[in-house]
Amino acid sequence: MTFKRRNHGRNKKNRGHVAFIRCTNCGRCCPKDKAIKKFVVRNIVEAAAVRDIGDASAYTQYALPKLYHKLHYCIACAIHSKVVRNRSREARRDRNPPPRFGQRAAAARPGAPGPRP
C-alpha cells in the first residue's frame, strides 16, 4: 500500500509503543509522538493592565511572571484551529520548520528606543 508521508505522520522510530496524551481541545486520545505540540508563553495579565499594575506596585522594577503552557492537539483539532495546514505533495517533502512570525529584531521595530540619526 502506498504511503503519504515518509514518517507515517509520527515521530516514532525503533519504538514499539508510545504513551497516549489527551488533546487539549477535545480530549481525544492521541499518541504522544503524533500529537501536534505547541508551547505558549503568555503574560499573566493582559497588555492593557501591565502599566496600571506597574504604577501600583511597591517595587520599581518588578517583572511580572509569565504563564508557560504546553498544548497538545490531535490532528483534527490542529487542522481545524489552523495550527497546521494541508500541504501539497511537493511541499510535504520540505522538513524545515515553518517561518516564525512576530519575532522581529529590536532595530526593525518602529518606535523602538535606539540611537537617533
Curated annotation (Swiss-Prot):
Q: Which controlled-vocabulary keywords does the entry list? A: Cytoplasm, Endoplasmic reticulum, Ribonucleoprotein, Ribosomal protein
| Subunit-level organization | Component of the 40S small ribosomal subunit.
**Entry GO terms, CC:** cytoplasmic side of rough endoplasmic reticulum membrane; cytosolic small ribosomal subunit; ribosome
Location of the region described as Disordered in the Swiss-Prot/TrEMBL record: 85-117
Provide an example Pfam family for this protein: Ribosomal_S26e
Q: Which PROSITE patterns match?
A: RIBOSOMAL_S26E
Q: Which InterPro entries match?
A: Ribosomal_eS26, Ribosomal_eS26_CS, Ribosomal_eS26_sf
Listed GO molecular functions?
mRNA binding; structural constituent of ribosome
Query: What is the annotated localization of this protein?
Result: Cytoplasm, Cytosol; Cytoplasm; Rough endoplasmic reticulum
Q: Where is the composition biased (Low complexity)?
A: 101-111
Extent of Basic and acidic residues compositional bias = 87-97
Give the protein name, as stated in the record. Answer: Small ribosomal subunit protein eS26
- Write out the GO biological process terms: cytoplasmic translation; determination of adult lifespan
Q: Which gene encodes it?
A: rps-26
**Is the Cytoplasm keyword given for this protein?**
yes
* Natural source organism: Caenorhabditis elegans
Family membership noted in the UniProt record: Belongs to the eukaryotic ribosomal protein eS26 family.
